[in-house]
């Protein structure tokens, strides 16, 4: 036992630890509260940033595919013009030339709005863009490649609008 300073008696300290300072306890409590508030603020900031990105992506997709319905309804018009050109043959005539110019202008306007024509003759069959309606034999075309196109397909900004209806070369 320390007679000069009884408050420093090691036996007494071991048995009765000094009470923690109430200010220290409050400081620790406030520090943990600050840590929680900071974590919440970071989480909210991340959520807000994710929401901004999602909204920007949705706006971009809405802009890219705003014409989808209109262009989809024009596909039968493209088919009719293409069939008319095929029926008109290759002989030049004012009617055929006018039909050809109209078809090309319409395709250009559609392409300027993100439409891409799929005319896959001779290309490998792609189930993501083509719909096989039959198999056939064709000289000079490898098996698994498109022999004939019954109906052209279309992509709108790299998303399939309508698959091409095709005949695929038979496997040996």
Swiss-Prot record:
Name of this chain's protein: Protein GrpE
SUPFAM superfamilies for the chain: Coiled-coil domain of nucleotide exchange factor GrpE, Head domain of nucleotide exchange factor GrpE
UniProt-recorded Gene Ontology molecular function terms: adenyl-nucleotide exchange factor activity; protein homodimerization activity; protein-folding chaperone binding; unfolded protein binding
GO biological process: protein folding
Region ranges (Disordered): 1-24
Gene Ontology CC: cytosol
Keywords: Chaperone, Cytoplasm, Stress response
Gene symbol of the encoding locus: grpE
CDD domains listed in its UniProt record: GrpE
Subunit organization: Homodimer.
Pfam families listed in its UniProt record: GrpE
Predominant cellular place of this UniProt entry's protein: cytoplasm
Subcellular location: Cytoplasm
Origin organism lineage: Bacteria, Pseudomonadati, Pseudomonadota, Gammaproteobacteria, Lysobacterales
Function: Participates actively in the response to hyperosmotic and heat shock by preventing the aggregation of stress-denatured proteins, in association with DnaK and GrpE. It is the nucleotide exchange factor for DnaK and may function as a thermosensor. Unfolded proteins bind initially to DnaJ; upon interaction with the DnaJ-bound protein, DnaK hydrolyzes its bound ATP, resulting in the formation of a stable complex. GrpE releases ADP from DnaK; ATP binding to DnaK triggers the release of the substrate protein, thus completing the reaction cycle.
Gene3D superfamilies associated with the record: 3.90.20.20, Head domain of nucleotide exchange factor GrpE
Family annotation (NCBIfam families): PRK14140.1 (NF010738), PRK14147.1 (NF010745)
Cysteine disulfide partners in this protein: none
UniProt similarity note: Belongs to the GrpE family.
């Amino acid at each position: 036992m320390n007679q000069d300073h009884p408050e420093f008696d090691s036996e007494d300290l071991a048995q009765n630890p000094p009470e923690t300072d109430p200010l220290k306890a409050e400081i620790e409590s406030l520090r943990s509260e600050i840590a929680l508030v900071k974590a919440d603020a970071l989480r909210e900031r991340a959520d807000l940033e994710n929401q901004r990105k999602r909204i920007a992506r949705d706006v971009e997709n809405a802009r890219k595919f705003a014409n989808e319905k209109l262009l989809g309804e024009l596909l039968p018009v493209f088919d009719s013009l293409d069939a008319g050109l095929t029926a008109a043959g290759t002989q030049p005539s004012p009617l055929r030339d006018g039909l050809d110019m109209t078809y090309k202008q319409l395709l250009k306007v559609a392409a300027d709005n993100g439409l891409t024509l799929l005319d896959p003759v001779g290309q490998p069959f792609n189930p993501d863009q083509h719909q096989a309606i039959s198999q056939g034999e064709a000289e000079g075309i490898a098996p698994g490649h498109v022999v004939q196109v019954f109906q052209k397909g279309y992509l709108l900004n790299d998303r399939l609008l309508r698959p091409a209806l095709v005949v695929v070369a038979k496997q040996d």
